[in-house]
Amino acid sequence: MDWAIKAARKKTQRKPGSTRSIIETLDDLNNLTTDAHSEINQRLYESSEWLRNNVYMNTLKYEDKKMEESLISPENTHNKMDVEFPKMKGEYELSNSQNDAAKDVTKTPRNGLHNDKSITPKSLRRKEVTEGMNRFSIHDTNKSPVEPLNSVKVDANESEKSSPWSPYKVEKVLRESSKTSESPINTKRFDNQTWAAKEEMENEPILQALKKAESVKVKPPPNSGIARSQRRSNMFVPLPNKDPLIIQHIPPTKSSGSIPKVRTVKESPIAFKKKSTINSPAIRAVENSDTAGSTKASSVFDRLSSIPTKSFENKISRGNVGHKYSSSSIDLTGSPMKKVSQKFKSINSTDTDMQEALRDIFSVKNKITKNNSPKGKNSRKSSIPRFDKTSLKLTTHKKLAIIAEQKKKSKHSSDVHKTGSRPHSISPTKISVDSSSPSKEVKNYYQSPVRGYLRPTKASISPNKNKNLTTSQTPHRLKIKEKTLRKLSPNIADISKPESRKSKNYRLTNLQLLPPAEAERDDLKKKFDKRLSGIMRSQQEHHRRKQEKQKRMSHLEQDLKKQTSFSNDYKDIRLKESLAPFDNHVRDTINKNTAFSTDNILATINTVDHREIIGNVTPKIASVNDSLPEINTDSEDEASVTLAAWAKSPYLQEQLIRQQDINPQTIFGPIPPLHTDEIFPNPRLNRLKPRQIVPKRS
């Protein structure tokens, strides 16, 4: 059991350098810092509460006057112009300075009951809250000034600006910035100055008591925790209802009930501020905290509305055409499911900004505008002329139809003058459409460049254009239009020519005239000649290759025959010379055994095709000897070995002793080099070798 207890103890004991011990020590350190911060915050909160109660008791000693609570009800604020403001006996500065010193890690401002009192109306307040407020807040009625309704508006604005991302506040600030010349930041600063001046005048004795009190200095929590907590606290702030980055200009509306302007303070608030802030460290701290808070928490919308830029001026002047959001485009709950995508531009709409920028660079005198361009919400008229195929076709078709009608009219009038009768009033109003029905479709005729006949097309013509066409169509203008049409579309045939006029009523032009038979024959002949020449050329090439192959084979046969005959003759001569001292019997046997006869099949096995065709019974040539050469072998029946006379041991020894000093080159001469191609004319390796390219004979 001892070993088990030791093992358990080892498991529980921490090794000094292990990862577990490091992580646990880090956790302990982290817990220490967080616990210390929470303790410090608790102590600070208690000390601030104690200090606030002491200051409040001191103020009661200084002032023995009766205080009353004056609350604002929503009914009185709407109907009456004069509103009583409650006095804040130094609570604003004290609460702000102490709350800034006692901020916890989350950095969320702690609003006491006295702060809620000045914002929430009496009718909307709960009973418990009012009782708690009555305990801690007593106000002087004798010193309460009388202010108009706009001062109430300023306080409401202050309460709204406590949340910088409020959509109602942003809307209100934008409206006020467009109505009045002053920016909302300037009005806010002015209101703060008046407020501070009043409070400084009233809180002189409190500030003297505060000078004696020592300010508690505490190291603030780390910045990472502040940033994280601030991010988490601002996570669920509702987004604005409208696009905040676009300032829309709203013209001032004349209301029936005119609101009087805020009266300026008789005494300068800046002078009061200078007098009081010379020897007041508490107010300096309050001001520093106010300025720091205002710079950090100042709204993006306030900053943008106070400092107008060139891009905002351009957006206001343009009227904000393309970026229109519906009321439900940005959801207040923050869910992306209800977001509506922006309306994209139509495909045919041009980029107007690019065209306006390039207007001075590419300026053309003769501008051709599009007649059938879609006039959507996002499309504007382009200052740069653009050639569109459809519009060009329509314009050319219309103009051609007008010219055709004019020619018809002039021709008809000339025929009438010839006959002597009065001409009928024929006008080109046949093409025109009534002004009441501009959507009617009219058939125009234009001449196709491929075929000679006229083809009807449909084109919509506006009534205003038809009036101009009917009134201002003169021969001079028609000529000018014809010239411009020829420049624009040179492929279109000229209608004024007699050939085109004839082809209008000529029925056979609808049919395609076939070329004559002779031309077809010539074409066919050329094609066939081409084909035949190709076939003939290939046949000739094949025949030429065959002939060359046969020639090569015949040359090889001749060379082989020469080589075999030369070798046979050479062998015979050498044998005769070497075997001169031998007996005739021995020489005859050697000749029989070693002679290479050319009358058998093996001599011509590589040159002659000895295959027999089935069914082809042809008499064999008598000259060819198909018999194989005789090879003398020992009979199997004989037990002893029969050897030639020169092969017997005593005779052989004599011959070897005699021939040991003989040089073979003196007898045989120089030995020629051995070529395998000469011995084997068609080996298998020759097939794998690349063929030599034979030059073509021209």
From Swiss-Prot:
Residue ranges, compositional bias (Polar residues): 422-439, 459-474
Gene Ontology CC terms, in alphabetical order: chromosome passenger complex; cytoplasm; kinetochore; kinetochore microtubule; mitotic spindle; nucleus; spindle microtubule; spindle midzone
GO biological process: activation of protein kinase activity; attachment of meiotic spindle microtubules to kinetochore; chromosome segregation; positive regulation of mitotic cell cycle spindle assembly checkpoint; regulation of cytokinesis; septin cytoskeleton organization; sister chromatid biorientation
Localization, UniProt: Nucleus; Cytoplasm, Cytoskeleton, Spindle; Chromosome, Centromere, Kinetochore
InterPro entries in the record: Inner_centromere_prot_ARK-bd (IPR005635)
Post-translational modification: Phosphorylated by serine/threonine protein kinase IPL1.
Molecular function terms from GO: protein kinase activator activity
Biological role stated in the UniProt entry: Component of the chromosomal passenger complex (CPC), a complex that acts as a key regulator of mitosis. Stimulates IPL1 kinase activity and facilitates its association with the mitotic spindle. Has a role in attaching the kinetochores to the microtubules and ensuring that sister kinetochores connect to opposite poles.
Comment field (misc): Present with 319 molecules/cell in log phase SD medium.
Name of the featured protein: Inner centromere protein SLI15
